[in-house]
Amino acid sequence: MLKALVAKGPGGRVIVMDSISQATPKDAGAIVVSGSHGGTSSGEIALGVPFKVVVFNDAGVGKDDAGVAALEMLQARGVAAGTVAHTSARIGDARDAWENGILSRCNAAARNLGLETGAILREALSALIDP
């Protein structure tokens, strides 16, 4: 599984990881693009590392918004989070999300940083690290 630093600037660093389960304490403060779905199990893992921003795949959203449930969990802790549309990036493929992802959902903390639904993920995150 891929885990790589793909961008770095005065505002931080962007790490892509195919699974959020690859996160470690060394990733604290990073902007993380994960290939994982944005469900509650992914949210629980993401809460264990203090990310600046974390992005998941919306996995088609699913019943009762299960594919994006992590966004509310993370918002409750003040963590900026979003999802890319499953139609824009393959689930489980963080590099594809970084290169082709379109934001489908953003929590309030992410919107406060300037992330918006419909934005090209790479451009939006690049603006955060190199304002």
Q: What are these language model-derived features?
A:
Residues 1-131:
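Residues that scaffold, gate, or flank divalent-cation-dependent active/transport sites
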